[in-house]
């Protein structure tokens, strides 16, 4: 057994939910500020440039690490003072892993911020072979599962923002993480998938492509300004389908 102490700089004991939410809020605030600085909606200046993929990916790595440490600190029973060496190594290797769940072209994935699944299905002509995934519904399933390690975090978000709005306040990376976890267990090579009500921002979209799969396109309403940063970015790689 390996005791996590001052030498490793990691404490495996539980932290209070208040501290967890504070960490999450700071992280979301930082991501929000980055989005506003990087993508100023409606700006006509010719000097506006889309940040490089590497910079956005770096934000994703840092955000994922902070979110992971916050979520893993939840323990409603007694603090855990020891972890095995294997557990520690698994955590660290997981943070360094940059291999996506699906290889390029292994699955066909479309993203869409449109929330109404009926409208989304209509866009794809009610294709019976298409799999439709809503990360908000996945989050709700997790919230109602007392055995899921992320249930306490989601319950705290509901207390603060309500059941109708807490999805919009998920910590950075959680929507993509829940989607990836579901797809890993339920999807296979050759599947055609629409992840709707997603992404919430450009960072989530980049995280999705880094850790889950390269997407085919993103389907949005024409002139939709709600996720302008996402649209601007994917227009540069010709992956936007406007309707």
UniProtKB/Swiss-Prot annotation:
The chain crosses the membrane at residues 50-66. It is a single-pass membrane protein. Residues 1-39 form a transit peptide. This is Altered inheritance of mitochondria protein 36, mitochondrial. GO terms for cellular component: mitochondrial membrane. It comes from Vanderwaltozyma polyspora (strain ATCC 22028 / DSM 70294 / BCRC 21397 / CBS 2163 / NBRC 10782 / NRRL Y-8283 / UCD 57-17). Belongs to the AIM36 family. Keywords: Membrane, Mitochondrion, Transit peptide, Transmembrane, Transmembrane helix. It is found in: Mitochondrion membrane. The keyword ATP-binding does not apply.
